[in-house]
Amino acid sequence: RAEDISEAFIASSKALLITGTHFSTDGVYKASLQALDYAARHNVKRVLDIDYRPVLWGLAGKADGETRFVADQNVSQHVQKILPRFDLIVGTEEEFLIAGGSEDLLSALRTVRELTPATLVVKLGPQGCTVIHGAIPARLEDGAIYPGVRVEVLNVLGAGDAFMSGFLSGWINDASDERCSQLANACGGLVVSRHACAPAMPTPAELDYLFNSPVPITRPDQDVTLQRLHRVTVPRKAWKQLFVFAFDHRWQLVELAQKGG
């Protein structure tokens, strides 16, 4: 709820990151707008991960959670209303299609640009990413394409979160587009090379090792040094028992409760 958002907490932050999924339901939509208002009031950088998931907009069945794109003008118009509020917008090619309301990427990007002067980061999968300031080029190739890390893909879960964490780690510290993209692509590449999501996120020590390797590491999961670094450089904390409720899995939990009486 909007009243649950802490202005003081947001004011203490360098950046506020919100995903597009949060705008798909009314309650979280209002809470997100409240958070954005606080961020703007305190000059906190505002970041949107478009994160388009058709199933969470009611455009795909529950069994189609992996579906990444379904064109829908209502969703496009809904997303376009909030685009002007952000300083940085990140998405895949398909996610910019929904944001721009077109199935042609460049046309979609031009529509987004008409709505916001934000920096746009287009994720290009294994190719890497491109960062767009100002006018949209005639071809993406006319701008800088920052290459991805070539690895054996074992699991794509968490790739987008890892990419964003890497990019933001540079961006909030005023790093160059090239450095932000290098960090983002490396984080995404390492996560997809592992059989995990959040626990697979790399540390700075792992990134340094990857960047300084004299040869490309295409199988990070088989690199003994990387495995060791991931074990010993991830901060450890003894947490008390946690009970976590994921809002996008409510119906499954309700069914379990009903079956259990």
Predicted regions and their residues:
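Solvent-exposed alpha-helices and their adjacent loops that cap or buttress functional pockets
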Residues: A8-A11, I82, R113-E114, V234-W239
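Alpha/beta catalytic barrel-like cores
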Residues: P216-G261
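Conserved phosphate-binding/catalytic region of the ribokinase-like
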Residues: D37-R41, N74, G101-V224
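Conserved N-terminal subdomain of the carbohydrate kinase-like
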Residues: R1-G20, D208-P216
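Conserved beta-alpha-beta core of the PfkB/ribokinase-like small-molecule kinase fold
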Residues: A15-T111, A118, P126-A135
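Short gly/ser/thr-rich secondary-structure transition/capping motifs
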Residues: R1-E3, F69-Q73, S102, V224-R228
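Acidic, amphipathic alpha-helical patches
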Residues: I5-S6, V79, V153
